[in-house]
């Protein structure tokens, strides 16, 4: 760890380069995960999340807390579990990137900044998915719940960052 961090918790040159590379690779993974057409991924089951509205080639899930509101409309407990798992993975979608950016970018190091930047990242992802649906029929879904779950992930990353920084100061 001494090769990556100085005694005060700041990065060494190698640490900064490593963190920047990891953030770039993870950002690329997010792009591939969020923007490739849905049909490129294996479909484990013919499953549709309840509450989705289709307008032409656009897929929207405008219901806040859809898992709770429409949870009674799924066919099985396993399908409900699949929906909950999707929400959990959305919480952690931006977590690693935000965590790395907190170390790299001083302007990110407040709760207000994390809330703003993470929400904007999430909104960009969702709007880009709509654009891709219009352009190439990617069958992506704009989900209101993704906005708050991704933002919550950013807040959790901020909490972990603060714990680590606090540990260095002890």
Regions found by a protein language model. Name each.
Residues 141-161:
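Alpha-helical transmembrane segments that form the membrane-embedded catalytic/substrate-binding core
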Residues 1-139, 158-170:
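Bulky hydrophobic segments
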């Amino acid at each position: 760890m001494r090769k990556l961090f100085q005694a005060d918790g700041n990065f060494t040159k190698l640490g900064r380069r490593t963190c920047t590379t990891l953030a770039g690779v993870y950002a690329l993974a997010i792009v591939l995960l969020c923007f490739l057409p849905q049909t490129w991924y294996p479909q484990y089951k013919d499953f549709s999340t309840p509450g989705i509205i289709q307008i032409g080639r656009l897929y929207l899930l405008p219901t806040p807390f859809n898992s709770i509101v429409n949870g009674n409309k799924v066919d099985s407990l396993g399908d409900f579990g699949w929906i909950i798992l999707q929400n959990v993975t959305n919480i952690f979608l931006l977590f690693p990137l935000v965590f790395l950016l907190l170390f790299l970018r001083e302007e990110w190091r407040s709760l207000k900044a994390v809330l703003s930047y993470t929400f904007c990242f999430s909104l960009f992802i969702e709007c880009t998915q709509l654009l891709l649906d219009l352009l190439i029929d990617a069958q992506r879904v704009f989900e209101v719940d993704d906005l708050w779950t991704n933002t919550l992930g950013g807040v959790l990353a901020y909490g972990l960052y603060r714990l680590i920084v606090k540990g260095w100061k002890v």
